[in-house]
């Protein structure tokens, strides 16, 4: 009898321990669910409060095209560097939900939440549940993640596709399967169709697989996935090359600026540093206990595209903007969690919680002022219906390149966000943004006959004054000036 009581007690104790273990195992998932819900609420706040920015208006303009063929022509002809997959997906999404600010931005919220879920899933696969939770907490409330979620642009979609591709590649490496390899290849092709930086990610993944090959690991299906991704993108390569040329030319007039003209020695040094870092990633001695080397993989996946942009900017031409690395920013949370966790799991958890709390405190102060398109439309509507609205044709340029002739945006870059909010009959007139004399003469002629007008300009100071009509005959008042982008509105 006593033996039976002892056995019963031991069985009961084992059951209690099992239940406690199950609850402990579920705790990271339960906490992540709470983080996910909180992130969804934060991402969804103020979606329709701010006017669309100029780039967001281009997303709406492309999505409103009648079909896929017209959408494909939009980035090719008018908006170099923007890839078509985001516009196509947004087109069908807005056919269901409409073209309002909330509808346009809500798709970014969906992809941002998908990115957050993929950060957690990758952490569980590559590291452990607690590291995954720490990484998800660091990314969920990061101001960058919130900005991406609040913007109707391709970056949340790009991040979600890239992280989904990384997850499938990881699984194909560790648990090879034909279906998984095909899915990995399709996702890999979707990356450059969303943003050309996806090609650099594919290159980084090829370096990872090359390391596996050098160490005697074949990864046949993983190589097939990369080959499938490249094969599916090949038909678009001529268009991508044309777009890249237009993108680089257009953006050196704008925020990228002209070549840095570093000395040859600096260019050689940059190339050698990049080559050395790549060789270390591919051939360096293993320092991780896990044969899959998750930390090295993350370093390569994040670091090699970043290095390519930096070295390309030094050797060739400025080509780097931090938002091009949106997938790497999300993956960096995993790398940070893994690195700190290797030192101390306690400090990793504390720092992750502290960082998330700090981000939540910062969020109310991180909002920038919206662009003035809504206000501009209201002011023009309050004026005369015959007053022309002038837009500068050409790429948006900086002060040093304002007079460089170019064929970008022949209808005027800022006409698209203006037309999103304004449906009046006022004539829209494109003037050459790189030819101030011709622009001024056109403005004087049309304003004289109409009795008034509006100039929407990206210029400031002397460059703007050179376009304005003769102050002895015309009065010009600056009505609006945006903070984030060089948008000025002058009432003539």
Regions found by a protein language model. Give the residues of each.
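Terminal, non-globular segments
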Residues: 25-492
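Short, intrinsically disordered terminal tails adjacent to the first/last structured region
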Residues: 1-25
């Amino acid at each position: 009898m006593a033996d039976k009581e002892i056995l019963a007690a031991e069985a009961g104790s084992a059951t209690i321990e099992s239940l406690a273990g199950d609850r402990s195992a579920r705790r990271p998932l339960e906490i992540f669910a709470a983080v996910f819900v909180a992130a969804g609420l934060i991402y969804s706040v103020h979606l329709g409060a701010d006017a669309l920015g100029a780039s967001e208006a281009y997303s709406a303009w492309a999505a409103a095209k009648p079909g896929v063929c017209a959408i494909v022509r939009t980035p090719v002809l008018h908006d170099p560097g923007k890839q078509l997959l985001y516009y196509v997906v947004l087109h069908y999404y807005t056919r269901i939900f409409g073209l309002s600010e909330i509808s346009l931005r809500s798709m970014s919220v969906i992809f941002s939440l998908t990115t957050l879920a993929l950060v957690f899933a990758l952490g569980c696969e590559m590291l452990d549940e607690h590291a995954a939770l720490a990484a998800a907490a660091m990314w969920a409330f990061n101001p960058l993640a919130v900005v991406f979620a609040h913007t109707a642009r391709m970056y949340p979609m790009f991040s979600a596709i890239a992280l989904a591709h990384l997850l499938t590649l990881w699984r194909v490496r560790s648990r090879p399967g034909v279906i998984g390899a095909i899915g990995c290849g399709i996702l890999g092709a979707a990356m450059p169709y969303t943003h050309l930086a996806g090609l650099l990610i594919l290159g980084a993944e090829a370096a990872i697989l090359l390391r596996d090959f050098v160490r005697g690991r074949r990864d046949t299906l993983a190589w097939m996935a990369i080959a499938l991704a490249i094969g599916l993108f090949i038909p678009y390569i001529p268009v991508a090359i044309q777009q890249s040329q237009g993108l680089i030319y257009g953006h050196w007039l704008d925020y990228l600026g002209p070549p840095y003209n570093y000395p040859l020695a600096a260019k050689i040094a940059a190339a050698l540093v990049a080559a050395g870092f790549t060789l270390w990633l591919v051939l360096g001695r293993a320092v991780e206990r896990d044969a899959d080397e998750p930390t090295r993989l993350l370093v390569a996946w994040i670091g090699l595209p970043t290095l390519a942009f930096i070295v390309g900017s030094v050797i060739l031409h400025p080509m780097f903007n931090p938002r091009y690395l949106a997938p790497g920013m999300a993956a960096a949370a995993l790398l940070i969690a893994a690195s700190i966790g290797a030192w101390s799991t306690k400090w990793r958890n504390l720092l992750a919680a502290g960082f998330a709390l700090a981000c939540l405190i910062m969020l109310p102060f991180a909002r920038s002022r919206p662009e003035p398109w809504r206000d501009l439309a209201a002011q023009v509507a309050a004026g005369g219906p015959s007053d022309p609205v002038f837009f500068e044709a050409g790429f948006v340029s900086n002060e040093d390149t304002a007079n460089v002739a170019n064929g970008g945006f022949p209808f005027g870059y800022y006409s698209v966000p203006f037309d999103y909010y304004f449906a009046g009959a006022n004539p829209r007139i494109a003037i050459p943004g790189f030819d101030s004399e011709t622009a001024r003469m056109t403005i004087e002629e049309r304003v004289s006959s109409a009795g008034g007008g509006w100039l929407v300009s990206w210029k400031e100071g002397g460059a703007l004054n050179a376009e304005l009509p003769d102050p002895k005959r015309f009065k010009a008042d600056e009505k609006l000036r945006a903070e984030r982008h060089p948008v000025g509105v002058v009432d003539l």
